[in-house]
């Protein structure tokens, strides 16, 4: 096999810079340069809850799925989505599964860093998603999964890798399986049309830093093209406006926006501190930038929001049974060969 030009994280070694802890592998290779400390873990959990509320607690964007084997790419340090899938897949009475099984599905959660500790039913895999999946024939084997979940990887995957990455995800699915993707465009928008001095400045620094590391900060707008090129069918897209601040007329979105204001400020810190400071910004200037962003977030007349791009598509059927209910209800073929059992201990 030819040598693999992309690096893989070999340890969870960290570096302490600017008052925060970062994964050494991340900052050395320009991949998701955000902290890995408790403050960041709490932010990720809160942000996950906001996104879950925005999508009305839908774990699966294609409706009526009952996946047995799930791959979660960009699972986050706390693997919140994977854990929620497992919590909701606990076997109920009348299940035909073995008495030794605790869950109706298995989830492999992939990221470059995971916290210590085990999560029942979830296999944690350390993997740089810039590496072609052919270099792993176990958890990333072809034709293995019913559902692949990929989210918030714009600052992790090289711009030149995205087409091949989506193709890799396509090839990990069984016929009839689904891929769902979610990306955010952290260029804050204002329904008022007024200019955003500080938020736009933050975005310019952040996006230029990502582009300098061969990342595409606007990749959410390209996902449908990548999926079509990879051969997906039944492609659907659900763009969202994530409100920031308590301005929306809809009570549910108004509440989400109220809670998102605090999380958005934390997100600007987490996503921005490494890149801003590395660009030569002094601590006092960074704090002034964040304070200016906070003032703009507090102005409800601006009606701020973050664009989100949710998209999903299906790998073409290959002789498997499927119930057509809006083209999205997938039933696994009971005769198919299952992968080796996963040790959940």
Q: Language-model segments: which ranges?
A:
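N-terminal charged/capping segments associated with class I S-adenosyl-L-methionine
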Residues: 1-143, 161, 183-211, 215, ...
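A conserved beta-strand element that flanks and buttresses the S-adenosyl-L-methionine
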Residues: 149
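Short catalytic micro-motifs in class I SAM-dependent methyltransferases
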Residues: 152-155
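A short glycine-rich, Lys/Arg-flanked "PGG" loop and its adjoining helix->strand segment in the class I
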Residues: 163-178
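A short hydrophobic/small-residue beta-strand
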Residues: 179-180, 234
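Short alpha-helix
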Residues: 215-230
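Short, well-structured beta-strand/strand-turn elements
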Residues: 233-241
């Amino acid at each position: 096999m030819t040598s693999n030009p992309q690096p893989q994280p070999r340890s969870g070694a960290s570096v302490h810079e600017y008052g925060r802890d970062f994964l050494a592998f991340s900052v050395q290779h320009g991949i998701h340069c955000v902290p890995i400390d408790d403050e960041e873990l709490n932010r990720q959990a809160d942000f996950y809850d906001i996104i879950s509320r925005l999508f009305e607690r839908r774990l699966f964007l294609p409706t009526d799925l009952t996946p047995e084997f799930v791959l979660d790419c960009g699972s986050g340090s706390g693997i919140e989505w994977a854990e929620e899938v497992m919590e909701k897949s606990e076997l109920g009475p009348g299940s035909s599964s073995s008495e030794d099984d605790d869950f109706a599905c298995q989830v492999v959660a992939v990221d470059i860093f995971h916290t210590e500790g085990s999560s029942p039913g979830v296999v944690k895999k350390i993997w740089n998603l810039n590496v072609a999946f052919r270099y792993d024939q176990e958890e990333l084997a072809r034709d293995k999964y019913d559902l692949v979940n990929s989210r918030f990887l714009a600052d992790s995957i090289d711009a030149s890798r995205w087409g091949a990455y989506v193709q890799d995800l396509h090839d990990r699915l069984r016929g009839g399986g689904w891929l769902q993707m979610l990306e955010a465009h952290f260029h804050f928008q204002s329904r008022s049309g007024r200019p955003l001095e500080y938020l736009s400045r933050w975005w310019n620094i952040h996006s230029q830093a990502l582009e300098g590391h061969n990342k595409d900060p606007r990749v959410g707008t390209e996902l449908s093209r990548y999926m079509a090129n990879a051969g997906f069918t039944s492609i659907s897209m659900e763009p969202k406006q994530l409100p920031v601040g308590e301005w929306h007329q809809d009570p549910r979105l108004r509440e989400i926006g109220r809670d998102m204001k605090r999380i958005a400020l934390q997100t600007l810190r987490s996503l921005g501190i490494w890149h801003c400071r590395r660009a030569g910004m002094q601590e006092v200037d960074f704090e002034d930038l964040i304070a200016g962003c906070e003032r703009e977030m507090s102005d409800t007349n601006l009606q701020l929001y973050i664009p989100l791009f949710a998209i999903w598509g299906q790998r073409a059927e290959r002789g498997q049974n499927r119930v057509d209910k809006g083209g999205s209800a997938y039933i696994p073929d009971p005769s198919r060969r299952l992968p080796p059992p996963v040790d959940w201990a």
